[in-house]
Amino acid sequence: MTIYGDMDTSIIKEKPKGRKDIITKVVKEKDLREVLLKVLEEIKLGHQVYVVAPMIEESEESTLKNVELLREKFDLAYHGKIPMGVLHGKMKKDQKEEVMHDFKIGKSKILISTTVVEVGVDVSLATVMIIFNADRFGLATLHQLRGRVGRSDLQSYCYLICNEDKERLHVLEESNDGFYISEKDFDFRGEGDLFGVKQSGDMSFSLADIRRDYD
């Protein structure tokens, strides 16, 4: 956008007709039970659920959740009675397509995945997004992931699971507006280097303000 700043842009601030704001909540892992109950409630209504983890496999050097661990956790919580799918970037193309097809047609009710579902996935009956270790993702990524639900007139929910109370995560509780979220992200991260590769940090201008003086 900096390089092509002289180009005309279109700004769309309205949701498609009938879409509702996604109710978003930051939840500590010790309070996960309320989320699991909500998942069960939504599935009984015929709806579906995304669960996102930052890792594919368990690592001795990391306490981050992974898709395999979460598959076991959710399978145990629901006594193996809810059909689930697992999706991640190491799977072969035909495997990924099969998992997504099963989820789209409702054969699986919970899809446990890495961020490969961030864009390009449209399942209108998906009404719950649960993101583990949410503090490890940027606001833009979290907003994109949240956008996988709320794709119909059904009320949808997003739960950000995080053991530490991170101020920036509450921005997503406050708003569904991508423009507002990007501005808050700008405030947290700084403007970075306009003429280099640094994407965060303060440029330390004495007078200029990038947002105020962009024209």
Regions found by a protein language model. Name each.
Residues 32-47, 68-215:
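C-terminal helicase module of SF1/SF2 nucleic-acid helicases/translocases
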Residues 3-71:
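Conserved interdomain linker/interface between the two RecA-like ATPase lobes of SF2 helicase motors
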Residues 1-2, 115:
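P-loop NTPase nucleotide-binding module
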